[in-house]
Amino acid sequence: KHAQRIETWILRHPGFTIMAAILAYTIGTTHFQRALIFILLTAVAPSMTMRCIGISNRDFVEGVSGGSWVDIVLEHGSCVTTMAKNKPTLDFELIKTEAKQPVTLRKYCIEAKLTNTTTESRCPIQGEPSLNEEQDKRFVCKHSMVDRGWGNGCGLFGKGGIVTCAMFTCKKNMKGKVVQPENLEYTIVITPHSGEEHAVGNDTGKHGKEIKITPQSSITEAELTGYGTVTMECSPRTGLDFNEMVLLQMENKAWLVHRQWFLDLPLPWLPGADTQGSNWIQKETLVTFKNPHAKKQDVVVLGSQEGAMHTALTGATEIQMSSGNLLFTGHLKCRLRMDKLQLKGMSYSMCTGKFKVVKEIAETQHGTIVIRVQYEGDGSPCKIPFEIMDLEKRHVLGRLITVNPIVTEKDSPVNIEAEPPFGDSYIIIGVEPEQLKLNWFKKGSSIGQMFETTMRGAKRMAILGDTAWDFGSLGGVFTSIGKALHQVFGAIYGAAFSGVSWTMKILIGVIITWIGMNSRSTSLSVSLVLVGIVTLYLEVMVQADSGCVVSWKNK
C-alpha cells in the first residue's frame, strides 16, 4: 500500500521527484548509495503532507471532431461509456448481431431410410431388365450381372442382368446457408446513467433504449426520455468474408465452414431452391447394394452420419442461434451526434440537507465505485454535491461518471458511480455541517493503467482500420494523425505530465526536440525529435480529453 502511495506521489510531483534524484546523485558516491537515498527520499515524501497537485477531471470522449461528434467502437461482450461536458453519461452495448433470412445454398441428407425395394432379373441373351421405378427420381437403382443357369431358372448358362430399386427417403438433413452482409442486423442498447436507477448497458427497462442498425439504415436516432435525442451513424464490420464461407446448420447448431469444403461433402444433396425435398442427388453415397444372387439382391442404407459430421466439424467456428436467426460476433464503428442531448436537473439548486449511506461503497471491475445514498433533507428535487478529494481535502481528484446526480424526491435511494484516483482519497457527499466523508483506498497502479489504456487505444485504432484515416484533404490527414496519436499515446502523456503546468509541458517538448536535432547519433536524434513532436502535438492540440473546441461547421 505504501509503495502505491509512493508511485502516486511521484506522478503528481514530477518536480520534487527530479529534485530528489539530483539530491541522491549529489550525496551518494556509489550507484547503490544513490538508489538507496532516492528510495528513502520518495518513501518519506508521501508522509510529509507536502503541497499536492491534484489530477484534474477529464472527459474521455473518443474522437477529435469537436464537441458534436464522437467516434466509438462497439464490440460484443464490452460496454462503451461516453462522457462530455454538459451532456449525460451514456452506456452503449452491442448485445446482438443477427443474420436475417439467410439463403439456403444446399441441403445434405445425413440419415435416410429405404422402402419399396423391387428387383427384376433376366436370363442370358434376353436383354437388360428394367423397372418403372427407374424413371422415378425418388428411387435409387443399380444394374448388375449375375451367373444364371439351370439351377436358377434359365435354359442357358451365362451372365444375366439384374436391377434393384428402392425408394430413398431422407429422415434428417443439414443445410448450408449463405449470409449476405446486407442481411445483418445489429442490436444496440443505449442507457443514460441516472441516479434514480443505476443503469448499465444491458438495462432495457425504464432507462435503456434498444435500437436496430442495418446496412440499409445505418443512420438511426434514439429518443432517450428526458435526455433528448442521440444520432448514431454506424458502419458494420464483421471481419468475415461471406463469399468464401458457408453456415452449416444441423438442428439447433450452426458452424462457419469453408464454401468449397461444404460443396465437396460426399452425401446426398438437394439444391437450396428445391421445394419438394424428395429428388435427392447422389443418393448412392448413403446406399449399399450387396452382391446379387440370381433373382435376389439386398440393399441397405448406411447409418446416421450426424456423429461423423460432428467429428469433422471439430475446430470449426460455432455460431449461436436464437429464434431461428444466426448470431455473429463482430464490431461496429459508430459516430455519435450529441448536440441534441441535454442533462436533467441543471436548473435545480444544491441539496443542503443530510445524506445517509444506504449501501456501502462497492468497487466495480472497471476501476470505478458505486455508492447508494438517500436524502433525508428538504428541498427536493435538488442536485447532489459530490466530490472526491485528497487526504488534505485541498484538491479535487478522480471523476464523476454519473454526471449531475439528482434527488427527485425525499427518502428515494440514488446510485452514484465515480472513478477515484489510485491510493487514498476522501469521498465527500453533501455540504457542511452534515457532510458525508468517506475514506477510500483504490488498489492498483497508475503506471500499469497507463500502459493498459495505451494498448486499448492501439487496439481501437487497429479495429477502426481505414475508417480512421481521411486522405481527402490536408485537414483530413492532420485530423487522422491527431486521432491516432491521441488514441495510442494519450494515456502515457496524461500519466507522465499530470502534475506539470501547460507552459512546462511546452518547454519540455521544445527541449527534447532541440536535443534531438543536435544529437550526433542518427537513431537517437530521430527518436528524440519524434518524442518531442508528439509531446508538443498532444499539448498544443485539443483531443477531447480536456480544453476548448471551436466547431467552424456550427458557426
UniProtKB/Swiss-Prot annotation:
Residue span of region Fusion peptide: 147-160
Q: Name one Pfam family in it.
A: Flavi_E_stem
User: Signal peptide location in the record?
Assistant: none
Its Gene Ontology cellular component terms are:
extracellular region; host cell endoplasmic reticulum membrane; membrane; viral envelope; viral nucleocapsid; virion membrane
- Residues flagged as site, Cleavage: 49-50, 544-545
Glycan attachment positions: 116, 202
Source organism per entry reads: Dengue virus type 2 (strain Thailand/TH-36/1958) (DENV-2)
The terms under GO molecular function for this entry are:
protein dimerization activity
**What is this protein's record name?**
Genome polyprotein
Q: Which residues form a coiled coil?
A: none
Q: Which residues lie on this side of the membrane: Extracellular?
A: 1-7, 50-494, 543-555
